[in-house]
Amino acid sequence: MKNKGIFYAFTIITLWALSLTYLLHYKINFYDPLVYVFMLVQTHLYTGIFITAHDSIHGVAVPNNKRVNKWIGFFCATIFAYNNYEKLSRKHHLHHSNVVTEKDPDYYDGNFFRWYLKFALEYITIWQIILMAITYNLLKLIFPMENLIVFWEIPAILSTLQLFYFGTYIPHRGEHELADKYKARSQKNNHFVAFITCYYFGYHHEHHAYPYLPWWQLAVAKEKEDALN
């Protein structure tokens, strides 16, 4: 397929939007196990929204059309809690060029909770909080409050934890081999686990070594790296 990037981006955005629309009308019963399954599915799709924005930052969501690539990235960053695409891009490139140093905006030499707090404060702004609050109060006029919390707000929070844990904390924590200039480790080669945890982003050494690869090609890169080693 020539335009895989557009296909994957469109698929993730469409599935997220359709499932959210359905779930905002879903009758919630907290004894219903499907409520929790749907919440996790929505979390995974929301994470996919950010991963698509991330690929756009690297210019690989739609590599043959810079304008469309940037538009998709801007759109995905915006619906991911009103993130500023230009700010994300600037900080993410700083992360790649200064990985695990004081200049790395994603790095913190501390425990999980303090690192996550620093990570969140690095990117979240007061304007995002205000816009999310306005959006919530407007949507509350149309949809049940508990549906908004369970299928929109909680997945938004969980997806940041998912991205942080599998895409920052696990790959970059602790000591790294001196020979590893990327200072990024990868999870074990298990494509199913890697996909459901964070769209292969757990193959983080491969991402830093080949930042021009979109998320769906990291599995192949992992296999090649393992074969070489």
Language model feature labels by segment:
Residues 4, 30-34, 63-71, 144-146, ...:
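Membrane-helix interface segments
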Residues 38-53, 73-82:
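A generic, lipid-embedded transmembrane alpha helix
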Residues 63-113, 173-229:
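Membrane-proximal soluble regions of multi-pass membrane proteins
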Residues 36-43, 101-195:
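Hydrophobic transmembrane alpha-helical segments that form the core helix bundle
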Residues 1-11:
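N-terminal membrane topogenic signal
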